[in-house]
């Protein structure tokens, strides 16, 4: 049987409170956390799964549910935004690792490690608009996998979008 629960979040609740974790933990074999989409389609540009946020999500969850029941979902994809000179931005489009690396090559820029723990590419146009891409590679994913230590396991979204070299380590 599948157990599903939905509760509308209210302004006085943070991300953790729409679900009654303790009750869910008492009736499920495993609880799979969506440890991605911190920055999503309609948010400002930013990382999909910042490491500090993943640590906070893990800490809160295991305060409510035994770690051996928790699976941490991690992103194999990234997000790509166009940012205008006035600060407005496009919807964050999903992007595969391979596509991000192809754009970096085309734009002649090197991905850099972002303070959130992911990779970041920025390409600036003469009009001061820019492209911003936040994504994961093998190294950044291995750091995120370490965050899952003490949990039941990990899951990934979405197969086929990853840095293929990660499979040598899984």
Please provide the spans of the model-predicted regions.
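Acidic/aromatic/glycine-rich contiguous surface patches that form carbohydrate-binding/processing clefts
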Residues: 140-170
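A residue-level signal for beta-strand positions that form part of recognition/binding surfaces
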Residues: 69, 132, 153
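Second-shell loop/turn segments in exported
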Residues: 41-48, 130-134, 156
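Glycan-binding loop/region signatures in secreted carbohydrate-active enzymes
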Residues: 74-145, 166
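Extracellular/periplasmic catalytic domains that process cell-envelope and extracellular macromolecules
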Residues: 23-27, 63-66, 113, 124-127, ...
């Amino acid at each position: 049987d599948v157990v599903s629960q939905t509760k509308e979040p209210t302004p006085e609740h943070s991300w953790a409170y729409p679900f009654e974790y303790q009750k869910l933990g008492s009736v499920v074999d495993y609880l799979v956390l969506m440890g991605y989409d911190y920055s999503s389609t309609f948010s400002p540009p930013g990382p999909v799964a910042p490491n500090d946020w993943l640590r906070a999500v893990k800490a809160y969850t295991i305060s409510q549910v035994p770690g051996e029941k928790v699976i941490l979902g991690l992103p194999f994809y990234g997000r790509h935004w166009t940012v205008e000179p006035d600060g407005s931005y496009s919807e964050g489009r999903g992007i595969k690792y391979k596509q991000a690396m192809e754009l970096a090559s085309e734009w002649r820029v090197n991905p850099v490690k972002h303070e959130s723990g992911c990779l970041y590419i920025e390409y600036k146009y003469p009009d001061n608009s820019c492209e911003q891409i936040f994504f994961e590679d093998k190294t950044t994913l291995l750091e995120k996998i370490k965050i899952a230590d003490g949990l039941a396991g990990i899951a990934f979204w979405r197969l086929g979008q990853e840095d293929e070299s990660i499979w040598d380590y899984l």
